[in-house]
């Protein structure tokens, strides 16, 4: 009898703890609100009220001429990547975009843009197949951080996908197109799980084949295309735009250097995206 009562008591305690735990969980819902932006929202998060929660950095939303500088619940505004104390009740977070005062054209020193494709390195879900998408990173120009996007095109062929992966890799199928910022002398670097041999950059494959490749751009075009030739798992894309003086004695620069890096998820779970 005592043993049965003890078991009942323990079961009741477990039930009460479970109820209390579930009652303390809250949902943070991401919404555009009245904002019109290109891209996709971060995934909603279910967390325990009062616990630490880190807001995502912006890798998936873009407004031309502006930068995502915060997430607001209507009362408080938090910076992307900031760790906060989760509220006690569920809340909706909408993005705050601030107009840029600088652009890549204003850079007076080499700028590096790094795009990571995998969740491990901060990317949000990438699921681009039979459609177009974007990936966003930040560049620092004269002390100001600005959003810079690349375009992912798989409308007719190709695929970009890191869904359900927790590593640094994203699957890319042949014929997917990535449009990136560029200038004469820009250096493009990519990393993949397997050797890159057929992928072209601005129509050329002038690199030493390998898991990490690097190619310098000869044209003065402001954007160039990368066409995936080697279906594989990719981790990052890095673009470095050099500074090119427009006048020998002047202080104005056009098409100055900048770098961009794209990263992808772990290959250890490669079967997840087959």
Model-inferred region functions:
Residues 182-196:
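A short beta-strand element within beta-rich, extracytoplasmic domains
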Residues 1-25:
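Sec-dependent, cleavable N-terminal signal peptides
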Residues 102-172, 252-274:
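N-terminal targeting leaders for non-cytosolic proteins
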Residues 194-207:
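Short, surface-exposed beta-strand/strand-loop-strand elements in extracellular ectodomains
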Residues 226-233:
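Short beta-strand-plus-loop segments that form exposed binding edges in beta-rich domains
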Residues 160-185, 210-214, 233-236:
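Short beta-strands within extracellular/lumenal beta-sheet-rich domains
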Residues 88-90, 185, 221-223:
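Extracellular Ig-like/FN3 beta-sandwich strand-entry sites
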Residues 23-102, 251, 270:
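Secondary-structure capping and domain/repeat boundary segments
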